[in-house]
């Protein structure tokens, strides 16, 4: 252990009396090391030696008053606290899984903890259900494209499933990161490699109804807001994802690889990662860089996870084509694309596994609180960490930064406040119905994940609505939409605007109302939007007259 080694070294360098204690004396910025050392020795009568560029080691019978000496930042007694190694998997190939250490998968625990079992849906190409790594790990499996979900001719689904839920400490092979997970396997990939949208939508619905806590979607289609002919947005897919979100399921999706986009790296996340409340995941390499294949996005790229040179399971029917290869059932014995596999698909799987561990460690947290925690505790990626294309803070390349499971598990602060109106992102059935004449409601907005909250308010003919927005810490706007509005996100809907706030800005209270009473009875939609990067809580008061 590091602590024992440090103590042994200091014992050789700094012998002291039997009743002496050892202290670390921190140096204030700009302090003269020699002057501080001399002052400490004179004050305590002890022995001082260098400990680090920012601290001294003191052997003395006491350190009272040392913290008040000029140039001293702190005094800490050593030996009272220590650190221990996190629990280490015993699987023989775990040392080859660099991603486990990169995201500090097990660093929060000294030994394998008992976390609640939860179901994770892998919506992909199926699984080699007879693989030893998945013995007792598959809760259910279903194919939505024909054939058996318990067979995988492509290998992609088995690789993803291994990263998430291969058996831990079973004495063979690799270590699945999400050790509490039970797999729900949905096969949606046809023999030609295509994923029909209908199959994906049905699979999402099935996974939710089967009790999935996390859904992994290592698939996607091109998003291009500048060219609608190329943009692959699907209302069917969006509705299926929304069903999962409303059911409290964490949905994790890959932001996509540039090989399917007009250029590389592509500047937009793929669908379904580019849907509200989905955790979009980009990839980073062993050296800390974000590869060019990983799509960028300033809004929908939430976190980065390992997505290069990963090692996982493969169907034994595929690895058997190389009978002389020793690691049958693992990617070393697979075809070329699995010998040095790279892609945001695999990064999404790592993030899904992380979501399982964090949700298990915070069993009372809701979906949006877990995803907020994963983003809030991510480690910022910059040129100092190996990512030259990354900027300080959130950026389009790595989102909030590198996934850090231990930081999320051990997070010392409060969880994000609950927004019980979510998801209420659009008009129609996606809105939150305000039923009483006067309502006060607290909610929140997030520029990157939840830009709009929409409230449905029924007004009688000749009625009037006054809305008051308070306690917002970011720029927000209010828009009232007429009955019949299908979406607040379409430009062609602008003719349906009944009223809107002007120059709201960072104010404590915003008031607006219809200057004349409405001529048409019906359900109006009140949209609250955040208009700048950031997040804010707010209080909305609506009064119908």
What are the language-model segments listed below?
Residues 48, 208-219, 226-227, 240, ...:
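C-terminal subdomain of the subtilisin-like protease fold in secreted/lumenal serine endopeptidases
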Residues 106-140, 147-198, 210-213, 246, ...:
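Subtilisin-like serine protease catalytic core
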Residues 186-277, 287-289, 331-348, 364, ...:
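Substrate-binding/access-modulating region of protease and related hydrolase catalytic domains
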Residues 375, 398-401, 410, 439-545:
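Acidic, Ser/Thr/Pro-rich low-complexity intrinsically disordered segments
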Residues 6-15:
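Bacterial N-terminal signal peptides
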Residues 69-119, 127, 132-133, 333, ...:
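Protease zymogen maturation seam
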Residues 29, 33-96:
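Autoinhibitory propeptides
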Residues 161-164, 184-190, 205, 213-214, ...:
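Hydrolase catalytic cores
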């Amino acid at each position: 252990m590091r602590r024992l080694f440090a103590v042994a070294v200091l014992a050789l360098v700094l012998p002291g009396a039997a009743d002496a204690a050892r202290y670390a004396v921190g140096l204030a910025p700009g302090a003269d090391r020699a002057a501080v050392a001399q002052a400490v020795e004179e004050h305590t009568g002890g022995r001082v030696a260098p400990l680090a560029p920012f601290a001294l080691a003191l052997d003395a019978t006491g350190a009272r008053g040392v913290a008040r000496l000029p140039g001293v930042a702190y005094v800490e007694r050593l030996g009272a606290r220590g650190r221990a190694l996190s629990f280490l998997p015993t699987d023989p190939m775990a040392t080859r899984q660099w991603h486990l250490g990169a995201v500090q998968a097990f660093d929060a625990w000294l030994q394998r903890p008992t976390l609640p079992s939860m179901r994770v849906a892998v919506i992909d190409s199926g699984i080699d259900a007879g693989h030893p790594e998945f013995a007792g790990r598959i809760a259910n499996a279903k194919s939505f494209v024909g054939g058996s979900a318990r067979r995988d001719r492509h290998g992609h689904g088995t690789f993803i499933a291994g990263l998430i839920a291969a058996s831990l400490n079973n004495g063979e092979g690799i270590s699945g990161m999400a050790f509490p997970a039970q797999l729900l396997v949905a096969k949606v990939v046809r023999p030609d490699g295509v994923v029909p949208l209908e199959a994906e939508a049905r699979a999402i619905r099935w996974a939710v109804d089967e009790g999935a806590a996390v859904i992994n979607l290592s698939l996607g289609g091109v998003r291009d807001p500048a060219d609608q002919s190329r943009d692959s947005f699907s209302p069917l897919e969006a509705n299926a994802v929304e069903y999962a979100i409303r059911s409290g399921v964490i949905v994790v999706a890959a932001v996509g690889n540039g090989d399917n986009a007009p250029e590389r790296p592509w500047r937009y996340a793929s669908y379904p990662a580019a849907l509200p409340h989905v955790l979009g995941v980009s990839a980073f390499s062993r050296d800390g860089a974000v590869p060019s294949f990983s799509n960028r996005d300033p809004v929908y790229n939430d976190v980065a996870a390992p997505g290069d040179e990963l090692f996982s399971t493969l169907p034994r029917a595929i690895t058997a084509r190389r009978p002389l290869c020793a690691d049958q059932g693992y990617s070393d014995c697979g075809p070329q694309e699995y010998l040095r596999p790279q892609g945001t698909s695999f990064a999404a799987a790592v993030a899904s596994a992380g979501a399982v561990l964090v949700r298990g460690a915070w069993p009372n947290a809701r979906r949006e609180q877990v995803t907020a925690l994963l983003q809030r505790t991510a480690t910022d990626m910059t040129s100092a960490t190996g990512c030259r294309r990354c900027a300080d803070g959130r950026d389009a390349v790595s989102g909030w930064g590198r996934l850090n499971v231990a930081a999320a598990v051990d997070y010392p602060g409060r969880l994000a406040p609950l927004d019980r109106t979510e998801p209420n992102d659009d008009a129609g059935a996606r809105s939150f119905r305000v039923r009483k004449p006067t309502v006060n409601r607290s909610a929140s907005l997030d520029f990157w994940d939840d830009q709009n909250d929409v409230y449905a308010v029924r007004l009688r003919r000749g009625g009037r609505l006054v809305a008051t927005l308070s306690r917002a810490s970011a720029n927000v706007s209010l828009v009232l939409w007429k009955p019949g509005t299908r979406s607040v996100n379409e430009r062609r809907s602008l003719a349906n605007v009944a009223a809107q706030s002007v120059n709201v800005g960072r104010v404590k209270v915003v008031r607006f109302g219809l200057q004349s009473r409405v001529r048409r009875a019906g359900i109006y939609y009140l949209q609250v939007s955040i208009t700048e990067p950031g997040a804010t809580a707010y209080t909305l008061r609506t009064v119908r007259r």
